[in-house]
Every structure is written in C-alpha cells, then in structure tokens.
C-alpha cells in the first residue's frame, strides 16, 4: 500500500513537471513586473520581503542576508520606487535568470538601473536571490511597457557538475587580467551583446561602448569573489564580490555583480556591474 502511494505521488510530481511549460526570459521579466507591482500596491518593505529567497543577498551597503536585514524595521525599504525590465536572460534549465532595467525614486530624487538575479524555486515560484543597482546621472523615460530584449540562449554543459569550477576559474583569470590592465581586460571578457553598468552613464552596449566605458574607468581593479551560483544546465552563472580601485586620486572600495554565460567560445560576461561604497561624510566642525 505504501509503495503504491509513493509510486503514485512520484508519477504525479513527474507529470506536473512535464506539464509545466519551459520558462523563458519573458517569464523572468514577468516576475520582475509582478514584484514591482506589489511594491506599488503594498509598499517596498512587504514586496522585497515576499519576493526574496531564503538565501537572498542585498547590499546595506555591504552584502547581507535580505531576510535578516528585513527582520529589522529600520532596514526595510520605504518610499515609492518605480522600476521595469528591459533586458533579461534565462538558463536552458529554466530555473536561473536575471533582469535589468531603469529605476526611479518617486519625485526623481534618484534614478539608475537595477540588476536582479532570479531563481525559480521548487514550488514553481520565482524569487530573487540578489538585488543591486547602479545610479545614473540622467533618468530613463518611464516606460513600464517597454519592449524586452532577451539574451540569447547559452550552451549547456556536457557535465553540469563541473560548471561552477569553470566559472570560478574564468573569474580568477579575469581578476588577474583586471589587476594588470582593466581597460583591455573588461571588453575582452564580454559577449558582443553584453552590458557594462557603472555609476553615471547609461549601460554600455556594444563593442564601441565597451571600449569607451573601460577607457573611462580605472586602469587596474583588484577583486575578491564572495559568492554566486550556476544553473543546472551549466550555461548561466552569477557572481558577486569586493572590488577596489584608484579614481581621482582616491582609493575606492565597492562591489561587483556579474552574469556569466557559456556559449561555443566558453564563458564570458552578459552583465558586468561595479559600484563604489557610499563615501563617508566628513564630520561636522566642532562635532
């Protein structure tokens, strides 16, 4: 009897999985839009808490557990924030994806581009595992119905079990190259349709824009990876870590977030984001 029920449950689970249509980049974008809609309807705090995975990472400004941070009422985001996806991608295995697009704080007090890593959980729901963003000098026009650009599909690994080691090796090689000559190394590490996200300008897209963005950046970047993950298909991965560089005569520290994709040429970047930590304010005179 027990065996019969166990077999029936297994078959039911299998049929449910088979009945579920394959996920696409549009599904990742749809999850992002539902997340944004809940933030408008119920507030940022409830939305960020409801849509975050148990192991989700936020930056406060250093990497921290989202669940632990939101447990403190003082850390819950407040105010009104608008954002919408314009670029997204997904693994062939359908459980790991990302999206990015413009954001704007109510009243135009701040604006930039968000960057979210998404994972489809065992219950079929999408939840974000990392949320970050880059401020820009100018706001993008508010277009929540903007057309979505989907990243092309990656190439699945023959042995998915070794994919994370490959990503770590690729990132270690990139870190060494960035420490020697970041302006040459960064463009070479990107797929042609990738993105560079830095504070100030809009995201750089295309080879000419990559070269310009890298030329405007630091000569050398020192990095240390903190974490990340890879898809079951071994074709998409995300990483984040610490970064340090010299700029304008000052030593800056910050963080990077990346999405890597495997294609026929190996592993390269779809998105490379790097932002400095907020600068400390000088103490008031006499304080």
Where are each of the predicted segments found?
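Short, structured motif recognition centered on aromatic/hydrophobic residues
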Residues: 35, 83-84, 96-100, 113-118, ...
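Short, low-complexity N-terminal intrinsically disordered segments enriched in polar/charged residues
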Residues: 18-46, 50, 135-184, 188, ...
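Short, well-ordered alpha-helical segments enriched in acidic and aromatic residues
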Residues: 41-62, 67-68, 180-199, 204-208
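Surface-exposed, charged secondary-structure patches
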Residues: 62, 71-111, 211-253
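Short beta-strand edge/turn micro-motifs at domain boundaries
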Residues: 111-147, 255-280
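C-terminal functional regions that serve as terminal interaction/effector modules
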Residues: 23, 200-207, 214-287
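Sec-dependent signal peptide recognition
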Residues: 1-8
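Hydrophobic h-region of N-terminal signal peptides that target proteins for export
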Residues: 8-19
């Amino acid at each position: 009897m027990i065996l019969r029920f166990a077999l029936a449950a297994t078959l039911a689970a299998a049929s449910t999985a088979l009945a579920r249509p394959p996920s696409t980049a549009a599904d990742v974008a749809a999850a992002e839009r539902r997340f944004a809609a809940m933030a408008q309807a119920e507030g940022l705090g409830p939305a960020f808490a409801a849509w975050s995975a148990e192991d989700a990472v936020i930056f406060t400004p250093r990497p921290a557990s989202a669940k632990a941070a939101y447990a403190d009422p003082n850390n819950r985001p407040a105010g009104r924030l608008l954002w919408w996806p314009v670029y997204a991608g997904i693994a062939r295995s359908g459980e790991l994806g990302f999206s990015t697009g413009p954001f704007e704080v109510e009243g135009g007090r701040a604006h930039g581009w968000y960057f979210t890593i998404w994972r489809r959980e065992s219950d079929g729901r999408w939840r974000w595992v990392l949320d970050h963003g880059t401020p820009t000098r100018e706001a993008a026009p508010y277009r929540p119905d903007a057309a979505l650009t989907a990243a092309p599909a990656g190439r699945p690994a023959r042995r998915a079990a070794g994919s994370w080691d490959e990503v770590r090796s690729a990132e270690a090689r990139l870190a060494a190259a960035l420490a020697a000559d970041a302006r040459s190394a960064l463009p070479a590490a990107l797929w042609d349709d990738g993105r560079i996200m830095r504070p100030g300008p809009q995201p750089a897209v295309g080879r000419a824009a990559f070269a310009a963005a890298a030329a405007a950046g630091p000569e050398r970047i020192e990095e240390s990876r903190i974490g990340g993950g890879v898809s079951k298909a071994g074709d998409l991965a995300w990483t984040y870590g610490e970064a340090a560089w010299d700029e304008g005569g000052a030593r800056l520290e910050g963080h990077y977030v990346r999405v890597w994709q495997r294609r026929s040429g190996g592993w390269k970047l779809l998105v490379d984001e790097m932002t400095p930590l907020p600068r400390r304010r000088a103490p008031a005179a006499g304080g």
